[in-house]
């Protein structure tokens, strides 16, 4: 076969791959074919590897897209969390949650503890694990969510915005109960929490014991209703009072001296 004929074939394959939106196939078919010859692979093994590369690239791009669409303030994975610096945390339980069973069962997860104890990191880590499982995820703070819902209500767009929040397979509400909110705002937040109860998962981080949530929602009846929805079948993980960030920094300094 002439060099010119081979060049035409390669160009045709690239065009076919482009038409079929098989970017990885178009970009790697030649190098993988050369590698297959070196490894003495058969045609089926080569084709399996080539299509496998396409599938893997699409999966990785999908994960990256879902992570971007989730609006994490910072990407933090559970693999990055130094459980050795927080031995009081139930590492096995958290890793089990990362497998995603709570998502299919629409169970809430609540991280409760002082500032700096790793709540946001672990919540983000679970959410990124969900992105890897092809779930639609959205991260927000309680204040951001309430502001968005209040603005939507003022613009007569509350139903549209609320429905969008219901479509996510997982939402993370960070910094719940950090600041008090007006009753009207608390009612809007309750709509989201109640609407997702037993339908879709939610992860919440808070620095307040449940007995003190009336500091955020002064209306005792509304506060109780919100807690009832959030804690029903919930995985409640207490992160304690000792700063994970401080201990991690301290251990790094000790390690550097060694």
Task: Name what the model sees in each region.
Residues 1-15, 252-258:
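Intrinsically disordered, low-complexity and often Lys/Arg-enriched segments
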Residues 8, 12, 20, 24, ...:
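Charged, alpha-helix-enriched surfaces in structured cytosolic catalytic cores
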Residues 14, 18-74:
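Interdomain "pre-motor" coupling segment immediately N-terminal to P-loop NTPase/helicase cores
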Residues 89-167, 216:
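Conserved P-loop
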Residues 170:
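Walker B motif beta-strand of ABC-family P-loop ATPases
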